[in-house]
Amino acid sequence: DTSQLFPLVKESGFDMVECFATDPLAKCTLEDARAAWGTSIIIWGGVPSVVLEEWYPAEQFESHIRDLFRTIAPGDAFIMGVSDNVMPGAEVWRLERIAELVEQHGYYPIRN
């Protein structure tokens, strides 16, 4: 559970975490990280690779990405990316959909 490391990350003086994995891949959420760090630590990630897989329900994928935009609004201290790796089983249309949503909603400041 990555959330157990939140206080240590903040105390360490790091100003960014990269490859930040969240639910459903890890037992923490982006909301948890924001509550712990605010915008004092830049988060790079937020898109768990499992949401790109064929077996992950398309409706949940769409919901996850839309919720991501709501959580990061207005967009301070966040760089969207796949939090681990794009795996061979990833569906390309899902990456294309993320790109579409970034084009539609990814301008600063992000509005809910």
Regions found by a protein language model. Name each.
Residues 1-112:
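Active-site loop segments of alpha/beta catalytic cores
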